[in-house]
């Protein structure tokens, strides 16, 4: 597989996160989707006061190639996590960090963070399979 497949996998994961996400109000969060990890993100006010700011760091490994992107956004819940997952033979690691304070999702903290959202990966697998057949 080449970097095109890596990019498609990352985009699909991020698209699913966006489709599954409702925004929260009142909380101020950083907001960017599928950008390189060193990229600065804009801020946004979330629609519901009980929302979470979420930071995702997504790494897709195809053969010996690694690709990382980050997403920062508002979600109504903190996503459930697992350890590591494989989608169509590719290793996908998603570090997730959730918080409930203004602008607390600047980055996924190093060490001790959780990995891989189960729902996102399930929907991503379906999306990848659908895209394969289209």
From Swiss-Prot:
Residues 106-134 form a propeptide. It is found in: Cell membrane. The keyword Lipoprotein applies. It is a lipid-anchor; GPI-anchor. One of its GO terms (cellular component) is external side of plasma membrane. Keywords: Cell membrane, Disulfide bond, Glycoprotein, GPI-anchor, Lipoprotein, Membrane, Signal. Residues 27-118 form the UPAR/Ly6 domain. Expressed in bone marrow. PROSITE patterns: LY6_UPAR (PS00983). Its main location: membrane. A lipid is attached at residue 105 (GPI-anchor amidated asparagine). Gene3D superfamilies: CD59. InterPro entries: CD59_antigen_CS, LY6_UPA_recep-like, LY6H/LY6L_nAChR_modulators, Snake_toxin-like_sf. PANTHER family: LYMPHOCYTE ANTIGEN 6H, LYMPHOCYTE ANTIGEN 6S. This is Lymphocyte antigen 6G. It comes from Mus musculus (Mouse). The gene is Ly6g.
């Amino acid at each position: 597989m080449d970097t095109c497949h890596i990019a498609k996998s990352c985009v699909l994961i991020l698209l699913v996160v966006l489709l599954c996400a409702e925004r929260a109000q009142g909380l101020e969060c950083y907001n960017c989707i599928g950008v390189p990890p060193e990229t600065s993100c804009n801020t946004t006010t979330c629609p519901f006061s009980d929302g979470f700011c979420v930071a995702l760091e997504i790494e897709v490994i195809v053969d010996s190639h690694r690709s990382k992107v980050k997403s920062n956004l508002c979600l109504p819940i903190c996503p459930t996590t697992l350890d590591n997952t494989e989608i169509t033979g590719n290793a996908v690691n998603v570090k997730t960090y959730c918080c409930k304070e203004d602008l607390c999702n600047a980055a996924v903290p190093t060490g001790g963070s959780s990995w891989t959202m189960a729902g996102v990966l399930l929907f991503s697998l379906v999306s990848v399979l659908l895209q394969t057949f289209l």
